[in-house]
Regions:
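...captures the hydrophobic TM-helix bundle architecture rather than a specific catalytic motif
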Residues: 1-263
Length: 263
């Protein structure tokens, strides 16, 4: 439902379907995390279960790496191979292709105006297109540093500093989510995603997938914060905190690569 609604945001029912799907996803994640937390508090997990969780998190991030790597690799191919080819900058054959098929196309990036397409009517300036992702990158980097620092304080049983740095990291993560949502929906409103061909298709896939991961990771951090305030998360059993740090750092690295190669 979430994917179907996201692909039809321009329709009247599209945002409603996307919100229903997002609500269902959050409900399922919350139910699973709460169940795991209750089982952990009841002492039902042993070293073998801890090892299983760690391997599960590893394979989850490994699969995410290939998914995001495929998306970023495809746009790198478009940027450095396809775009120069249709602009006639890749040898004699590409010059002939450019002359016969797309004589008016000029190489540019980001590829907001693909060959044989009308220019997208955009209220976004090129400066805004790059500035907002840069601001988000800085916010994510700061939140990742604070989250790592919070993990360090938890390990050394400095729970007050752990709560402070974790709360700040969550606040920065929420700020990223708000700015990114604004950015995503204004790209839609400005027709950049709808009328930019392959670049627009890539943006909706990459930004949407990354945004979903941020929402899920923030939910994870909220539950960790709640457990710390209840004095139920201690230095002796930090896997849940380790998993949150790994996931958040992974999303920061993905956004850094996306910023430098996409925008």
């Amino acid at each position: 439902i979430l994917a179907f609604g996201s692909l039809n945001l321009n329709a009247k029912w599209g945002p409603i379907a996307a919100l229903i799907g997002l609500g269902g996803l959050i409900y399922m994640l919350d139910g699973w995390l709460v169940s795991v937390t209750k089982e952990s508090n009841a002492g039902l997990y042993n070293l073998q279960m801890d090892k299983t969780f760690r391997w599960g998190m590893f394979w989850f991030l490994f699969s995410e790496l290939f998914l995001f790597g495929l998306l970023i690799g495809s746009i790198i191919f478009v940027r450095f191979s396809i775009t120069p080819w249709i602009a006639g900058q890749s040898g004699d054959a590409s010059q002939l292709t450019h002359y016969l098929l797309w004589p008016d196309f000029v190489k540019h990036w980001p590829l907001f105006t693909p060959p044989s397409a009308a220019p997208a009517s955009s209220s976004f300036s090129m400066e805004s297109i790059r500035r907002i992702p840069l601001i988000n990158l800085i916010i994510l980097l700061c939140s990742a540093l604070l989250l790592t620092d919070s993990r360090y304080h938890l390990k050394h049983k400095r729970y007050k500093l752990c709560r402070l740095t974790l709360n700040t990291a969550i606040l920065l993560g929420g700020t990223f989510l708000a700015i990114q949502s604004y950015y995503f929906f204004h790209l839609m409103k400005a027709n950049i995603i709808v009328k930019s061909g392959i670049y627009g298709s890539f943006l909706i896939a990459f930004l949407g997938l990354h945004l979903l991961n941020i929402i899920a990771a923030l939910l994870f951090l909220f539950i960790l914060c709640f457990r710390i305030y209840q004095n139920k998360l201690f230095a002796k059993n930090p896997f849940s905190f380790d998993a949150a740090v790994w996931w958040w750092d992974f999303l920061v690295v993905i956004w850094a690569f996306g910023f430098f190669w996409i925008f």
